[in-house]
Amino acid sequence: CPAIQRCCQQLRNIQPPCRCCQ
């Protein structure tokens, strides 16, 4: 997902790796 940062911000996932968009 190219918009991983936005996805993480919405889900508030600060800890990498962030797999919010999978």
Swiss-Prot record:
Highest rank taxon of the organism: Eukaryota
GO biological process, one term: defense response to fungus
Single annotated GO MF: chitin binding
Keyword terms, alphabetized: Antimicrobial, Chitin-binding, Fungicide
Record's comment on post-translational modification: Glycosylated; contains 2.5% carbohydrates.
Comment field (misc): On the 2D-gel the determined pI of this protein is: 10.8, its MW is: 14.34 kDa.
Described purpose of this protein according to its UniProt entry: Chitin-binding protein. Has antifungal activity against F.solani, F.oxysporum, C.musae and C.gloesporoides but not against P.oligandrum. Depending on concentration the antifungal activity can be fungistatic or fungicidal. Inhibits both spore germination and mycelial growth in F.solani at a concentration of 0.1 mg/ml. Has antifungal activity against C.krusei, C.albicans, C.tropicalis and C.parapsilosis. Has no chitinase, beta-glucanase or hemagglutinating activity. Acts as a flocculent.
The protein's name: Chitin-binding protein 3
Provenance organism: Moringa oleifera (Horseradish tree)
